[in-house]
Amino acid sequence: MTWSTPVGLCTGLAALVLLSGPGQAAPQLRVEGTEFVLEQDNGRVLRGEALAGAVLVLPQGRIRIASVAREKPPYGSEIFLYRFLVENSAGSSQELCEPDPNGQRLGFPLQVPGEPAGLTCTGGAVGKCVRFGYQPWYLSKEGLPLKALHQACVNLVTANYGGDRGTTRNGTPIDIYDRFGIQQPAYAPGMAFEAAWSPRGAVCVARPRIEQNISLDEIRQKYPHLQGFVGEEACSEEKMRGHPDALLFNRSYPGYR
């Protein structure tokens, strides 16, 4: 499937508390997948659309849940999409998230196994990869934890070949697909194979997505572990299909600026 590659916000949810009324005990808030679940002190549980209008108190400030929507991804559980408004002491508010490629300012909480919960926006790589079907709390049909595919997807979307920094540019078109059938190739005309991907970065690189940001020679020099796996002769989908570390693949436009 073909997508553009914006980068977006991801903020931690450490010390997350839902605003309670005077004299009320603070309710317990948890994250299940991409859904907030609130358990009140009387045992009542609120979740989904019932939390529209609630206010989250974070170290960064107060964030109001303005609305809640749902969508079904290509694979995995239902995704909850929240519109978050950051409120200030003067009573005004502003959107937490920048517009995604569809012009929507949405986000959701995310609980990755073994990591603190956080907020992510749909315009960023972390959020986009969840919506692609790579839900880090889920298993593939083959029993592989999708946490590995999600991290590989984040590397892919950001063109993070060595696992240390992204080299993409906002709005760059890419065609994402994988060996498990969660995302299928779009075969967009003019696109060519770019790389195969793992949770640690690229497994091989046929050519860089944005050559002005990093060249093949720079990739060879910066990432010795990719020696022998750089360039079109050394890196192709056919060769990588059998590589155990190659989970995701992508195509992009040669010479894209």
Q: Which stretches of residues belong to each language-model region?
A:
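Extended effector regions of multi-domain proteins
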Residues: 34-36
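Bacterial N-terminal signal peptides
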Residues: 8-19
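Boundary at the C-terminal end of the N-terminal hydrophobic targeting segment
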Residues: 23-27
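Long, compositionally biased low-complexity segments
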Residues: 30, 40, 52, 57-257
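N-terminal secretory signal peptides that target proteins for export/translocation
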Residues: 1-4
